[in-house]
């Protein structure tokens, strides 16, 4: 399950992580997490701006100035990351994530007329999970001092300690990240995002949740649409379900998501509930975006060498990769 990928955007000394692609005026626009390559023993990279690049063909890229820089004020105290962009009424809407000083994640909104200049929405954040089902600060999560006693300072530990912190505390501080927006047939928008569920629903549950909107500004939560038990720390590098990408094809909604080393895919006739559907392991792909281009289904990969399926030597060192899917009607997709 290692597909053939071509590196189409290399940034020596830097890496690309979760990203999105949108086509406008004969150009592809890429927005994504980026950062400087660090040694494994160094602190977790601070991803404090959003990269912007353009391409006529998904292969030759021009990098432009960053479009979003963290403000240093709530809710953007430490990180801004994981953007997703959609067009509506001659404007562009970007949902992106922001972290406060505790690492609590919230989804914010920015808008643009040209994809180059962006204005934040004054009412940010626009999406946070409901306390009725989510793990959220003050509701079953440790305080800052308790976290320090577990492993030391959360913002200055290495990557292995970070995952150990997640395992011991039952999750990140208030998970709400990695939005992916789709236009539904009825004209409303649905945003998928990831979080963790509280213990009343079961032990150590992670999920893809969703919210709906008529204007991309005001969002009504649906709640979890897919959930599973998190992977054990010793077996996989990523405890969370993350990086959802949803595609409508063959009268079904196809949900791609990352968990562990792998990207998985499931589908449902409803965009609101993927639970109980068959899940297929697609392969080693990180933060995949799936789209149709020139009559082909293509898939992106990022951050690591596509042959380094255990992230042993290349995590957060590589740029954007492009691969292909074999996706016949009536079947789930496979890497080419």
Residue map of PLM features:
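Carbohydrate-active catalytic/glycan-binding domains of CAZyme proteins
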Residues: 1-336
């Amino acid at each position: 399950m290692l597909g053939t990928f071509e590196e189409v955007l290399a940034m020596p000394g830097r890496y690309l992580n979760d990203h999105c692609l949108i086509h406008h005026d004969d150009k592809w626009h890429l927005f994504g997490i980026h950062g400087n390559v660090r040694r494994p023993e160094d602190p977790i990279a601070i991803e404090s701006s959003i990269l912007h690049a353009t391409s006529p063909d998904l292969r030759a890229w021009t990098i432009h100035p960053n479009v979003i820089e963290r403000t240093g004020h709530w809710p953007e105290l430490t990180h801004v990351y994981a953007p997703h962009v959609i067009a509506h009424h001659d404007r562009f809407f970007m949902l992106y994530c922001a972290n406060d000083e505790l690492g609590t994640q919230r989804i914010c909104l920015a808008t643009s007329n040209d994809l180059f200049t962006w204005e934040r929405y004054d009412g940010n954040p626009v999406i946070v999970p409901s306390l009725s089902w989510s793990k959220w600060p003050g509701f079953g999560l440790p305080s800052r001092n308790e976290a320090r006693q577990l492993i030391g300072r959360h913002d200055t530990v290495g990557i292995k300690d970070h995952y150990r912190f997640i395992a011991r505390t039952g999750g990140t501080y208030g998970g709400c990240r990695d939005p992916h927006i789709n236009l539904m047939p009825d004209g409303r928008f649905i945003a998928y995002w990831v979080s963790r569920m509280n213990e009343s629903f079961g032990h150590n549950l992670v999920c893809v949740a969703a919210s709906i909107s008529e204007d991309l500004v005001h969002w009504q939560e649906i709640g979890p649409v897919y959930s599973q038990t998190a992977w054990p720390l010793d077996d996989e590098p990523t405890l969370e379900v993350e990086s959802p990408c949803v595609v409508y094809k063959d009268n079904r909604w196809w949900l791609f998501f990352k968990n562990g080393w792998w990207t998985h895919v499931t589908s449902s006739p409803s965009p609101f509930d993927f639970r109980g559907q068959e899940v297929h392991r697609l392969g080693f792909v990180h933060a995949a975006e799936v789209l149709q281009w020139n009559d082909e289904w293509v898939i992106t990969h990022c951050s690591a060498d596509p042959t380094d399926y255990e992230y042993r030597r290349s995590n957060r060192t590589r740029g954007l990769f492009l691969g292909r899917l074999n996706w016949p009607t009536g079947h789930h997709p496979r890497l080419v």
